[in-house]
């Protein structure tokens, strides 16, 4: 081949498809989609089987979704989340298209926030022959009449299609009854996971008939314990996960379920079941010793006796949630942390936990102790620096997620310990830790920390000019009233030269929450927040940060999909103008209470952030409703726009 000058052109060889697939394996799904537009080879690579498994497409019901569904028909398999379906013709056409194009390829279907008719779903389900997961949570419109699947021919069609269904979510169904439950579950003989969270289940008493629950066979008004036990007994060989959260299950009812012969549960969720007692947990542990994941959060009657029972009886436990179990103390936690299989522990809002027994349990036998990768101590106000320092050393090799939100006694010492020992962290939450300052994030020690403060030095009593209060002396200044000591230019130069443990060391972070840490300023945010893989960042309620922080974060954290800057008075259009060109991946943006944000920022988002799904501009009084409407009409993926209190000014003008 020759060019216009008669010289030979050497053709550049194409990369092998396997190499392109390997390159794309390092990209996020959204970036891989953009890369597929480069050329045909890159498109074929993006369709590789490894990228298609566990792929879920989420979109609202609209006319434009019809073309999307037709395009998905070329994939070998996929999962769908379709929102806001109703009983009108467009939604019916959408479901029909799903059945025609994806019937044999669809693995999972969820219909949140929808109100569809029985006829629409019954025309779809017989076509979904490969379905493994069905989510019908909150679809009261299906069960209100009680006629769903009442005809034998419909049940036969659905049973033929759903014989391989493994997961069924029936959470928050107000009108679920014995009749409708039996009809539906008779079509799904091989269930592995069942969720009935938030359903109205009569465990002991039938309020409609004034008799014990289950006395009336196949009630058309409510779902009874007798019927639930029947299902668990019939499918005991396959059922491994059960969710009864937010129900009124009693200790006797839990024992009835746990004692079903040959039932071997691996996961049980009982969040918010406030009738449960320590005795019921002891019985559960005795009859279901193979449990690996247990959620007994917000069961407010439970005490440390339950913790001891779990520690002694569940030796295969990997995940445990005790969140909001307010009566739990330190007792039993040391023994719990000796369960070597434990990987995730949630103690958030356990107000009596100080961390002492956790440290004690982890410092026991090194061969038989928990290797935690997730630890939540949110709102454990007794947690102090010593506990955090010890935990970071003991869990340094395994911990990937740490939540210290509202641990008000945590200071810069804890931040430095985290930066030193937990360099594999992926998620770090420090929101509302009000004692954290720039010095902690920078990994430096404040120069004047050990010197007596002139303001607080004892100079004897000082009188005030106001004699009408309780006394004559000036009250001591409260710690949270003090302005943080500013980091100077010389301090920053020292930071750049030293090899101290700053938050920069956490270069694997994907989520960081520093909201409501009021002593943080631009000095640390601009120097430390430089994470190429960071996805979610919250800097809300930081009164000292300005546009400089926003611009720096956008420049150095270009993978951000969620950014929260609510109630940051120093953020303005100028910062958005500097940041928006770097935030192409942004999907969720929170700017409520940022009074210096105007219409100009919305036009910048329209220009640069076309993937935006959620926008919160509540109380941004310099934004006009007209611009909000324009933004909603132009951004194809924008689903949620919160704009309370922005019409105030225009309303006054009309008056």
Task: Specify the residue positions occupied by each region the protein language model found.
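Conserved positional slot within leucine-rich repeat
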Residues: 56, 81, 110, 135, ...
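N-terminal adaptor-interaction module of cullin-RING ubiquitin ligase components
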Residues: 1-260, 265-272, 277, 281-285, ...
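Acidic, serine/threonine- and proline-enriched intrinsically disordered linkers and terminal tails
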Residues: 202-222, 443-506
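C-terminal interaction modules of eukaryotic adaptor/scaffold proteins
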Residues: 560, 582-655
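Tandem repeat domain/solenoid detector
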Residues: 251-252, 266, 278-282, 286, ...
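Leucine-rich repeat
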Residues: 103, 128, 162, 173, ...
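Flexible, disordered linker segments and immediate boundary regions flanking tandem C2H2 zinc-finger modules
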Residues: 194, 206-209, 347, 357-358, ...
